[in-house]
Amino acid sequence: MSAAAGLIPPPVSWAQRNDLIYVIIDVECKDIEHKVTEKTFTFKGVNVLDPSKKYEVTLNFLHEVDPEKVTSKNIGRCLEFTIPKKAAGPYWSSLTTDKTKLHFLKANFAKWRDESDDEEGDQKDNSMFGNFLNSPGGDWNNKFDDFNVDDEEEDSDDNIPSLSQNDEDDEEGGEGDKEKKPAA
């Protein structure tokens, strides 16, 4: 990472897939300049809310990327760069070649996907749930007709145990039997 004097690095987050890297500049900027080479990502911009804050950052990628296929989206409060890896393969252990932790760089767990999730692929087959009720054993309308519920029969709560102390007092002739007189 390098930055010129007077310039500060913007907050940057990143995530990866088997075949690409996401780099997100987590600040709303104007006068944006960016350049991606096979080994580096360079960003310059000015904070929209505070024009005295000028940002610049250069990231040295751990492995090579394909700069010709980079896409970017301005999402209002952040800029998202989708950067294809030169060669799809195992996940990178780090985004950069830097041996020290960069204070402005963090993982974006909202976009992050585990390596095992990538192996399953993006197209998970959830189609079986769409036809759940039409499947064998899924005729639920007829299942409820089998219940023998007699609406005319009264429920009996004679065998239900008491839950409060007052109910026990009522049964034993305790205070619950005393008639309360209204206040005059």
Curated annotation (Swiss-Prot):
SUPFAM superfamilies: HSP20-like chaperones (SSF49764). Residues 115-184 are annotated as: Disordered. Disulfide bonds: none annotated. Residues 7-96 form the CS domain. Keywords: Cytoplasm, Isomerase, Phosphoprotein. GO terms for biological process: chaperone-mediated protein complex assembly; protein folding; RISC complex assembly. Disruption phenotype: Delayed border cell migration during oogenesis but no defect in border cell cluster cohesion or subcellular localization of integrins. Conditional RNAi-mediated knockdown in oocyte somatic cells has no effect on border cell migration. Conditional RNAi-mediated knockdown in oocyte germline cells delays border cell migration. GO terms for cellular component: cytosol; endoplasmic reticulum; nuclear membrane; nucleus. Its EC number is 5.3.99.3. The modification Phosphoserine is found at S116, S127, S135, S156, S162. Residues 147-158 have a biased composition (Acidic residues). It catalyses: prostaglandin H2 = prostaglandin E2. This is Cytosolic Prostaglandin E synthase. It comes from Drosophila melanogaster. The lineage of its organism: Eukaryota, Metazoa, Ecdysozoa, Arthropoda, Hexapoda. The gene is cPges.
